[in-house]
Design a protein with these regions (language model features):
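Alpha-helical cap/lid subdomain in secreted, periplasmic
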Residues: 39-46, 62-195
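Serine-esterase "nucleophile elbow" of acetyl-processing enzymes
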Residues: 1-53, 58, 63-70
Length: 195
């Protein structure tokens, strides 16, 4: 199954424009409706979802090279770690090293690439996920990346945000969410639209 998805992403990459925003995550991230969200929130940049089921931080660097590097994204939203709870518990240092390796590969490909490390959802206050998210935050800070905290349900109303973006658009600002906007806005839009 994964090989078919990888082949599909490679074919899509041949059609994709260089740069833009890439979501590189696992599990439910595959189903993020990027087209609808891009339209609803007037995100001007191209948004590509290159998420796969069961991505571990152990194989993320290789998969990034296979299915994302060809696009040469200007922004990467990393949402990796869901499959690594046991690995993290057994060896948190190795987890951190693998995540740093992934970030290093992204930066080597494009030094100006903006990277957001997105936390894992922890709506049930699982102490293991809380600790993993602390490590993700530390990794983001130490690697000079943004940290997108989506661990807890937040009071965020997508409709209100969409209406505000629409208003800004209507009064003459033609590019309300260009690539240089805060990454946290993109994280909220892409990962919290259904929270």
């Amino acid at each position: 199954m994964r090989e078919a998805e990888i082949r599909n992403y490679k074919k899509l990459n041949e059609l994709a424009d260089q740069s833009g925003i890439v979501i590189f995550g696992c599990g439910e991230d595959k189903n993020i409706p990027t087209c609808e969200l891009r339209q609803a929130f007037a995100v001007e940049s191209k948004v590509y979802n290159r998420s796969l089921d069961h991505i571990s931080v152990i194989d993320a660097a290789g998969l990034y090279g296979e299915i994302v590097a060809q696009i040469a994204p200007e922004t990467v939203l990393l949402h990796i770690g869901e499959e690594d709870k046991d690995f993290f518990t057994e060896n948190p240092t190795e987890f951190d090293n693998k995540y740093r390796e992934l970030i290093g590969i992204i930066k080597a490909q494009n030094r100006k690439c903006r990277i957001a490390v997105v936390s894992l959802k922890n709506y049930d206050n699982d102490p293991q996920l809380e600790e993993l998210n602390k490590h993700l935050k530390y990794i983001a800070e130490s690697e000079q990346c943004e940290y997108g905290d989506i661990a807890n349900k937040k009071v965020w109303n997508p409709k209100t945000t969409r209406d505000a973006v629409s208003f800004v658009y209507s009064i003459g600002f033609a590019h309300p969410l260009k690539i240089n906007r805060p990454l946290y806005d993109l994280v909220k839009i892409m990962f919290c639209y259904n929270a």
